[in-house]
Structure formats: structure tokens, C-alpha cells
């Protein structure tokens, strides 16, 4: 059971509440849903990366059998701490259930958005042992959306992998909704009433704000990605650490909050996560080019 420590005693955060926060974070993160998941020890772990598959061969009864020679390498996966501080009014201190509900409703989405944004390269990575999809090749889907998607999928196949998941941003969704065939019918939605993009080229599609990366001086505007998500691993250190204080001063974008003076308290939540992937198994989807 996680504990909310204060200067005036302690409030217990039930295990089921902590578990629900973690579960909803995973459900809110497209990257977490598509990637393989492992439990990560605090000191990190070395994981094997297979860069090529073993190739079998037909042989006659007495001939030598082919010896598989897959290309193997390793990567160090490190747990990096993600933290957020959320201020509350004192009325939540009088009602623990209201506090728990507020935590469950407010924390997961923000944690998930930051994680996805970091994986896509919108946010600077926390350390060298955290991979980002910004290393993957980008394919323009702005002018001929269908051909751009096929080019990205083909590149992944040529590299020896199989696409099994698209992640698009709201901006990418707009491009897909605007793609039409020669008769003017939408290509990527079942009906105009749905307004969603459930699948692309027969592959599962998910949406997250974190998949959008604004155009840079030498990089295109990124609106999504596609890849073989068996080549991506999310590691998490069990549990979410939560503590509370009513004697602190918070620096926010809007100014300074003195918790004691303003009759408030703040909850700090921390979780440790890691991410590793084989970027050759992924392609980014761009709205235009870098030029």
C-alpha cells in the first residue's frame, strides 16, 4: 500500500487505487498498449535484441543441416523517473474517496501523454538508455496519403519486419479523414457518421496527442508512426509512489502557490519507466517534408 505522508500524520493510498492509476496510465498510452511489457528492476536490465531471424533450409536425409546464425545484440534498459505535482483544495483532505477519484481521473492521462510524447521525440529523452522513434525514417502522407502509407509499410517489410500497429495524432487523423478515392468516398473510415479511423491498411490504429511533433528547422511535422511493436519494450518498476504536503511552495507557469497560505495541499506522484525499441522496425508519418 502506498502512503501519503504529511506533517500531521499519514493517509493511506489503497493498493487498488495505485493499481488503477497504473492500469489507466497504460490504457491511455498508445505506446504502452502496443509494446511488450516487462517488470524492470530499479537498477535496470540488459535485454536481447534480435536484428535478424534464423533462416531454415530444405535438406536431404544425410546432408548437413543448416545452422541458424541470427544477429543478436543487447541493450541496457534503465528506469527513469517521471513525476508530477497536482495541487488540491483542502476539501479533498476531508474526503479520501474524493481524493482517490481525483487522482485516478487526473494523473493517468498526463503521465501517458508525457510518455508517448517522449517516445515520439517531442520531449527530450530522460537518458541515453531510452529510445525514441525520432530515429526512424519519415514518410510524407500529406499529398498522396495512400501511397505514403504504403511506402512506410513496405519499408518496414523490406527491413524484415511486419507492421502491426499505427499510432496517429489528432492532426494525423485529420489527414486520413480527408483522404478520398476517385469517386470522392473516404478511404479510411467505415462511415461518415463514425468519424474515426479504426484501421489503416488492415492494421490496428490508435490515437494519442503525444504522436504529434511540430516541424523543426530540419525536420518535418510528424503526425504519427507505424511499426512492428513486437520490437518495442516498455519496462516499469512496480508501483507508483505518492506523497502529499501542505507546507510547500509550488512554482507553476502561472506563478507561485503557497499551499499553507491558500489553504491547499499538493500530491506528488512518481513512476519509473523505460523504453527500448529497434527503430528499423518503425516508420514515422509526416505532414510534408523537412524542406
Feature map (PLM): residue ranges:
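Beta-strand elements of well-folded, non-transmembrane domains
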Residues: 51, 90, 271-275
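Alpha-helical scaffold segments that mediate packing/assembly in large oligomeric complexes
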Residues: 73-76, 81-161, 206, 284-285, ...
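Assembly/oligomerization interface modules of large self-assembling protein complexes
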Residues: 2-82, 149-150, 281-282
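Short helix/loop capping segments that flank catalytic or ligand/cofactor-binding pockets
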Residues: 55-58, 95-96, 175-178, 185, ...
Amino acid at each position: 500500500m502506498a502512503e501519503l505522508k504529511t506533517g500531521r500524520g499519514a493517509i493511506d493510498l489503497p493498493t487498488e487505487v495505485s493499481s488503477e492509476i497504473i492500469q489507466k496510465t497504460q490504457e491511455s498510452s498508445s505506446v504502452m498498449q502496443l509494446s511488450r511489457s516487462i517488470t524492470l528492476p530499479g537498477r535496470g536490465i540488459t535485454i536481447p535484441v534480435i536484428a535478424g531471424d534464423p533462416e531454415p533450409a530444405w535438406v536431404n536425409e544425410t546432408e548437413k543441416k543448416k545452422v541458424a546464425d541470427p544477429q543478436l545484440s543487447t541493450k541496457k534498459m534503465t528506469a527513469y523517473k517521471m513525476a508530477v505535482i497536482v495541487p488540491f483544495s483542502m476539501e479533498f483532505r476531508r474526503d479520501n474517496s474524493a481524493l482517490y477519484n481525483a487522482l485516478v481521473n487526473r494523473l493517468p492521462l498526463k503521465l501517458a501523454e508525457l510518455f508517448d510524447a517522449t517516445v515520439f521525440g517531442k520531449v527530450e529523452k530522460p537518458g541515453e538508455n531510452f529510445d525514441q522513434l525520432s530515429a526512424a525514417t519519415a514518410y510524407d502522407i500529406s499529398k498522396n496519403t495512400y501511397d505514403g502509407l504504403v511506402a512506410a509499410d513496405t519499408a518496414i517489410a523490406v527491413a524484415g519486419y511486419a507492421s502491426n500497429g499505427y499510432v496517429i495524432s489528432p492532426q494525423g487523423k485529420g489527414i486520413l479523414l480527408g483522404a478520398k478515392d476517385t469517386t470522392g468516398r473516404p478511404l479510411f473510415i467505415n462511415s461518415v457518421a463514425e468519424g474515426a479511423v479504426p484501421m489503416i491498411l488492415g492494421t490496428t490504429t490508435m490515437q494519442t496527442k503525444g504522436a504529434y511533433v511540430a516541424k523543426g528547422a530540419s525536420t518535418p511535422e510528424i503526425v504519427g508512426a507505424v511499426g512492428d511493436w513486437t520490437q518495442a519494450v516498455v519496462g516499469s518498476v512496480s508501483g507508483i509512489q505518492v506523497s502529499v504536503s501542505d507546507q510547500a511552495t509550488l512554482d507553476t507557469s502561472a506563478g507561485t502557490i503557497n499551499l499553507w497560505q491558500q489553504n491547499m495541499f499538493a500530491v506528488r506522484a512518481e513512476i519509473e519507466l523505460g523504453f527500448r525499441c529497434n527503430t528499423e522496425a518503425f516508420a514515422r508519418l509526416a505532414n510534408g517534408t523537412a524542406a
